[in-house]
Each structure stands twice: as C-alpha cells, then as structure tokens.
C-alpha cells in the first residue's frame, strides 16, 4: 500500500477528550474517528488491525469445532420477554418500535436469538453437540461511554453458543472454547490471564474472564503467587482467618464520638487501630426475610464486595444501599454511628469480623460508639459469610501461596449457562430414550474491538504504538529518503516494494513528499514492526537500514540481503 493512495490521517497533538493511552494513540495514529458519544468510524489503519484480530479469532474458534453464522443486530423484543431479560438488562438494552409499532431491540448479545434458532432447527440428540458463533456488531446504550473503543456503545464482538445433551458435554465444549481463547490470545502476542468470574446478568454457573494485563485496566485481578489460581476481585474468595478469636481483655464502654463520622476519623481521633473497627452497611433486603433492610458488617480496613453481597439470598438484587432516611426511621441513628450491639434488624458478619475481639463499632446513637465489643458476651455472632474484597497478601483460596493484585482489561468471557435460557425458551431435543431433554448451553464472547485497544495499552512507548507482529496493520514500512529528488533511491524503493508485496508481505510504502522526520514519526506512531530506510548515504555503502520498532535497534543490511533479512525478522 502506497501512502499516496491511503488515508493515513495521523495527528501530531493528543485530543483533549482522550483519557487512556489506547484512545489517544488510536486517534493520533488515524485508526478511529469519533462520530458521536460511544460511536466510532474505523479508518483504514484501524480496520486492518480489527480484521486481523477477527481472523485469528475466527481461525481458532473454527478449529475448536464451532460453525460460523450471522444473526440480525435488530431483535424482536418478545424474545427478550421470554427469558425475562427485557427488564434485567435495564437501560443498556436499546428499545425501539418500527413503523407498525412492533417493539424491537438492538442486540447487546444473542442468547435469545440463537436459542430460538436451535429450538426450531435441532430436534434430536444425534445433531449434537453443536456450537454456533458469529462476529457481529453489538450495541449497548452505555450511560457513560469512555476510553474510546474500550467502552463504546457500538462494538464488534465474537459471540458463540454451544448446545449439548448433558453437563458432561457442556464441560467438554466449555474446555474446547477455553483452549481456543488461549490459542487466539497467544497468537496475538498478548499477556493475559483467564480468571474465575461471576456470571452476572448472563446467568449460569461456571464462568471465566480473560483479562489483558495493563495498568489502565478497570478490573482488579487476584493471582496466587504459587499456583495458576486467578480470579477477578468480584469472585476471589477471602478465606476465614486461620486464627481463633482471642479472649476479651476489655469491658464494653460507650464513648462520645461527635466528630467521628467515618472510620478514618474514628481511628485518628480516638487512637483505635483500624483493624479493630467495623463498618456496618445497610442494604435493601429480599423477600427471604421479614425485614426491609439488612446489615452487612465488614472490618474497617476492608471493602464490601457488592457481588458477593448481592448473591446472598437475604439481599435484594440488584444491590441497593438503604438511604439515610430509611436507616434513621428504623434505627434512630445515621451512617457513621451504626453497629451490631442492640441492633434489632438481621445482620450478616464477614469472616474477618467473626474472629475479632475488643473491637469498636457504632452504638446506633448519633455521635456515640462502643469500644471493647466482644462476640457472645455483648452481641450474638449469628450468620457469617465472605463479604469482602480480597487484599494483597491474603492466603490464596487454592491453598498455595498468597494473593497479589494486578489490573486487567476484560477482553473475553466464557459461561456454562446450563439450562437457564433453554428451559425458559423450551429448547429441547429427543434424547436416546425418546424423551424430551432440555439442552445444556454455553456462551462465549470476545470483544474484538476491545482487544485492539487492549493490545495498545500493553504495547506502546512515548513515540506511539508497538504492535505485535500478528495484528500489526502492516508488517513492513519502506521509508525512502528524498525519493522525489533521488532517482536511484526511488528505483530501489520501488523494486523492494514490488519484491516484498509479491511475496505476500504487507508493506506500507511511504511515497509522500514529506520531510524524513515527519515520515519517521508517522511510521513509529502507527507502530509498524519493521522499517526499511533507503537513502543515498547508506546506498553509497551498499546498504539499507533496518529498524526494529520494538527494540529500536538499527541495523545496516546489504542491499542484496534485505529481503532475506526481512523474512527472517517476520514472526
């Protein structure tokens, strides 16, 4: 490809509204342009990368035995009503009506559509297992689109759906897709981790996310220092402390704390160690209990894990914190002065809190706390659960090593759905015994456009993008110095361009009438892995200059050897 025939569209300055590196560089490198909030046009350079990611994903998913299909972006609303997700998805599900006032949605995912297809097309266990996938545009009406294509409203996604006669078949399909994901991300040259995850709005049981490791990642991931265990912060289990609760050494005393409305203020003003304090958080209760709200108690230096809390049967879903007005009406005190002693509402205690002694908590009286609280003596312990986020140094749930935390960007997710959707939509086949069997489903997604941004977050320097070879927009750049003034430079560049392209190598030939500095800056910004510089000075010595984008190393290479040298560098 010649730059004279190409829409390069690079920018010198970083746009003000671009927050993360990938967004900044995708705009500056001419990969995308913003059309509206969360909506982007993919320019030629960006599209080349996107297609390469798509092709790698397609090849590995094909190799796993899945079959490609293509489903409509527009879906009938009634399908979403069948599964009950029409309300669960909330405002992210964009609804509209056609000219006949029939309700539709823009597809954020396709479980309903694929289940409807399979229930109409598959009737016997002999047609199973079956795994269908598509690479298609999706739309989620994000409340706050940000970070460019990382959290856009419209995005490209690979979504696959497996159908099996039993759980053993589902587990086999799930493992095949897990392995396919690993092969795809390995080929892309990404540093990633598959981690245990919560199933969230999709539903089902087993679930893993695939995260590209990057400091800009929105998600926290917990890893064992001595095993392959990894889980996102929502799923990572905080084990019960391996110590017994100490015997009381203090009497419970009521203390005036008028200026201590937070844990930090309590610690600072009264000298109480933060690990000797607890936070009492009130959330809306479910119909499982005869109370409007329920208290969740965690240690003062720990954070409530909202996903773990929401998964408790006594807690309403979605999780909703009780308002100060509701708390005051029931207890007579406000946030900052709440605790378990004398509390006449149900409460659940975190595992770390259950082993505490001589601790401090609100007295359920404004401006007062109890110090020296002990379970059993001053208040009954009751129900104990894992309620908190893990912290670095916690013992790993696998029993090996401790946990360390890193940030990651979720680029893929796999679920063992079971029969959540197939049962709701009556998707069944005749089994070997002639009886109807509800199918076991798996669903699998890769955010193709998000992979592009994630790769940049992991591969860049102050000059621009450093693409892994497999997903670079071009493999090689040819930069001729003053080509329009030197006939021999032009001839050498044209000859090399013809040779490399004839071999199937993707080349960007910078034939612009531009200063060398501008040409070099653009090539580095775009991130092409291998650059060949052709100039009169090096040709006088019988050489071209080869430059590796990742290492920055420059190497003189004999003109006669340049093609073989380039071939040896390509991965």
Swiss-Prot record:
Biological-process GO terms, alphabetical: prolyl-tRNA aminoacylation
Enzyme class label: ligase
SUPFAM superfamilies for this protein: Class II aaRS ABD-related, Class II aaRS and biotin synthetases, YbaK/ProRS associated domain
InterPro entries cross-referenced by the UniProt entry: aa-tRNA-synt_IIb, aa-tRNA-synth_II, aa-tRNA-synth_II/BPL/LPL, Anticodon-bd, Anticodon-bd_dom_sf, Pro-tRNA-ligase_IIa, Pro-tRNA-synth_IIa_bac-type, Pro-tRNA-Synthase_IIa_type1
Keywords: Aminoacyl-tRNA synthetase, ATP-binding, Cytoplasm, Ligase, Nucleotide-binding, Protein biosynthesis
HAMAP family found in the cross-reference section: Pro_tRNA_synth_type1
Name of the protein: Proline--tRNA ligase
Originating organism: Vibrio parahaemolyticus serotype O3:K6 (strain RIMD 2210633)
């Amino acid at each position: 490809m010649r730059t004279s025939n190409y829409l390069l569209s690079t920018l010198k300055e970083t746009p003000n509204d671009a927050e993360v590196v990938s967004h900044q560089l995708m705009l500056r490198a001419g990969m995308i342009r913003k059309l509206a909030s969360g909506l982007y046009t993919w320019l030629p350079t960006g599209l080349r990368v996107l297609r390469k990611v798509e092709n790698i994903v397609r090849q590995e998913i094909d190799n796993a035995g899945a079959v490609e299909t293509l489903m409509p972006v527009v879906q009938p609303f009634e399908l979403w009503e069948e599964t009950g997700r029409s309300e669960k998805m909330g405002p992210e599900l964009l609804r509209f009506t056609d000219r006949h006032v029939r309700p539709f949605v823009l597809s954020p995912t396709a479980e309903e559509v694929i289940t409807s297809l399979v229930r109409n097309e598959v009737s016997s266990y002999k047609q199973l297992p079956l795994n269908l996938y598509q690479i298609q545009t999706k739309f989620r009406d994000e409340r706050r689109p940000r970070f460019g294509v990382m959290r856009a409203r419209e995005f490209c996604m690979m979504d696959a759906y497996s159908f099996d006669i039993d759980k053993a078949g589902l587990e086999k399909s799930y493992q095949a897709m897990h392995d396919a994901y690993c092969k795809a991300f390995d080929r892309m040259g990404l540093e990633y981790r598959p981690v245990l995850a919560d199933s969230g709005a999709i539903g089902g049981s087993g679930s893993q996310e695939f995260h590209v490791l990057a400091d800009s990642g929105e998600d926290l991931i917990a890893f064992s220092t001595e095993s392959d265990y990894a889980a996102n912060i929502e799923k990572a289990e905080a084990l019960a402390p391996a110590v017994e609760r100490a015997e009381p050494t203090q009497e419970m005393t009521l203390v005036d704390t008028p200026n201590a409305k937070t844990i930090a203020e309590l610690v600072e003003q009264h000298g109480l160690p933060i690990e000797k304090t607890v936070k009492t958080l009130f959330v809306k209760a479910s119909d499982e209990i005869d109370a409007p709200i329920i208290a969740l108690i965690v240690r003062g230096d720990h954070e409530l894990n909202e996903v773990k809390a929401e998964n408790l049967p006594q807690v309403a879903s979605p999780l909703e914190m009780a308002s100060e007005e509701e708390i005051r009406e029931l207890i007579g005190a406000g946030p900052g002065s709440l605790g378990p002693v004398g509390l006449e509402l149900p409460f659940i205690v975190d595992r770390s809190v259950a082993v505490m002694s001589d601790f401090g908590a609100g007295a359920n009286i404004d401006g007062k706390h109890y110090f020296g609280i002990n379970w059993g003596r001053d208040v009954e312990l009751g129900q104990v659960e894992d309620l908190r986020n893990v912290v670095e140094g916690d013992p790993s749930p696998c029993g090996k090593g401790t946990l360390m935390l890193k940030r990651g960007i979720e680029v893929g997710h796999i679920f063992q759905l079971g029969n959540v959707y197939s049962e709701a939509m009556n998707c069944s086949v005749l089994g070997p015994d002639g009886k109807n069997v509800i199918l076991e489903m798996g669903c699998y997604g890769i955010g193709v456009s998000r992979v592009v941004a994630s790769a940049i977050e992991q591969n860049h320097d102050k000059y621009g993008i450093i693409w892994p070879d497999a997903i670079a927009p071009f493999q090689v750049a040819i930069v001729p110095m003053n080509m329009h003034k030197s006939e021999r430079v032009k001839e050498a560049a044209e000859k090399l361009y013809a040779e490399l392209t004839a071999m199937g190598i993707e080349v960007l030939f910078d034939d612009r009438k531009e200063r060398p500095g501008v040409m070099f800056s653009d090539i580095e910004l775009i991130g092409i892995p291998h650059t060949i510089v052709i100039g009169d000075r090096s040709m006088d010595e019988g050489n071209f200059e080869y430059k590796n984008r990742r290492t920055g190393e420059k190497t003189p290479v004999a003109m006669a050897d340049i093609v073989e040298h380039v071939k040896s560098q390509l991965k």
